[in-house]
């Protein structure tokens, strides 16, 4: 009689293993208040190009493969916010332009401010 040892793998372990394979390893450390430049893949017809989107990170959410950042910038006098999934294939590159010094986890108060009041102090130690 040969006893077979069958390894039981739960569904959650399979999902976690798959998600860990899909994570991008080369992402920089991003903090709320940082000014970042995100390279977004745009497909027009059969052409693909990378369009830069630069702004201030006003929120970070979730973790792992579902991690997102909300980036706000002013375009032609109007505030524009975009939410990026960091591990998405649509995000081609991510570069921190400058570090920001803030004391909040979410910077939603920047939505109500205009002009120079929307600036974030620069941090030099990170």
Swiss-Prot record:
Q: Which UniProt keywords apply?
A: Ribonucleoprotein, Ribosomal protein
- Mind listing the GO molecular function terms for this protein? structural constituent of ribosome
Name the GO terms of the biological process aspect. Answer: translation
Top-rank taxon: Bacteria
The protein's matches in Pfam families, at most eight in alphabetical order, are given as:
Ribosomal_L19
Q: Which InterPro entries match?
A: Ribosomal_bL19, Ribosomal_bL19_CS, Ribosomal_bL19_sf, Translation_prot_SH3-like_sf
- GO CC annotation terms, alphabetical: cytosolic large ribosomal subunit
Which family does the UniProt entry place this protein in? Belongs to the bacterial ribosomal protein bL19 family.
Supply the HAMAP family for this chain. Ribosomal_bL19 (MF_00402)
Query: What is this protein's function per UniProt?
Result: This protein is located at the 30S-50S ribosomal subunit interface and may play a role in the structure and function of the aminoacyl-tRNA binding site.
**What's the name of the protein?**
Large ribosomal subunit protein bL19
Native species: Prochlorococcus marinus (strain MIT 9312)
Q: Which gene encodes it?
A: rplS
